[in-house]
Amino acid sequence: FVTNGTSTSNKMVWHHTVAPGDVVVVDRNCHKSILHSIIMTGAIPVFLKPTRNHWGIIGPIPRSEFDIDSIKAKIRANPLLKDVDAETVKPRIMTLTQSTYDGVLYNTETIKSELDGYVENLHFDEAWLPHAAFHPFYGTFHAMGRKRPRNKHSVTYAT
């Protein structure tokens, strides 16, 4: 257990898994502790871009953003990664805000199965979703749960 809160938990996950120059995949609507972690570890981010409505309110990240080919395209387009081969590099971590400040939830099992083995560590920032593990309504909408299969290759973190 961490008594300092989720910001510290997020930084602990990142400092444990990420090294300078690592490619990381991050929710563009992430918490500032993730931005701090990017800076402190020296990681190079590619961002998953959420939708916005005509009032500018942030919505969900489209499913297509989680496609491996889409992530590789983001790596190729990032000027900080011009010397990185998008076909061979494996992102060190993917961090997703789950749920968002507006209550958007993602099906974590879908994301885990899509990225398992491509991204080494799957990190779900669940600071706004601690109750999900205690109610069946949320099913696969939280990162870890009883009697749910583990990833074959990637490590999953929930903070």
Question: Where in this protein do the model-derived segments appear?
Answer:
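Conserved PLP-enzyme active-site core in the AAT-like
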Residues: 4-159
